[in-house]
Structure formats: structure tokens, C-alpha cells
């Protein structure tokens, strides 16, 4: 009488979709209002002048201009600003 035990379950076999994080527009490049500059988890970069922050910490331009990255403050925070041309 042939018999076969039931196959066990596995805890693997899943993967999440890529989130496409990172800097989208680099320093010196021009932007128009609404363009996404950085997609990030948390505040790796902070919003400076003419830059807004979405609820998922995405930084976007609020005015037309040129992107500038700078390190400021006692804690070495990295800020993204948009300078009007």
C-alpha cells in the first residue's frame, strides 16, 4: 500500500515590488514647479527654499529654478533648495 506524506508549508516565496527611491534631479539641473527631486524613506534630505515635502517624505519643487544640494547646521543636515533663475 503506497503512501505519501503531505507536503509541508513554507514561509518563503514572497517579494515586494521595487520602490524606485533616490535622487531624481541632481544639483545644477533645472526644475519646474511640481517636479520630484528626491524620493526617500525618512528625511535623509531636508526641504530648503522653494522645496516642499510630501507625506511620504518625497521632496518636490514648489517653484521653477535650479536644484542645489547643501550641508548646513550643527548636525550636518543635507538640504535641497531650488534657486530661482
From Swiss-Prot:
InterPro entries: Ribosomal_bL27, Ribosomal_bL27_CS. GO terms for biological process: translation. Residues 1-20 are annotated as: Disordered. The keyword Cell membrane does not apply. It holds the Pfam family Ribosomal_L27. GO terms for molecular function: structural constituent of ribosome. Gene3D superfamilies: 2.40.50.100. Keywords: Ribonucleoprotein, Ribosomal protein. GO terms for cellular component: cytosolic large ribosomal subunit. Belongs to the bacterial ribosomal protein bL27 family. NCBIfam families: L27. This is Large ribosomal subunit protein bL27. The gene is rpmA.
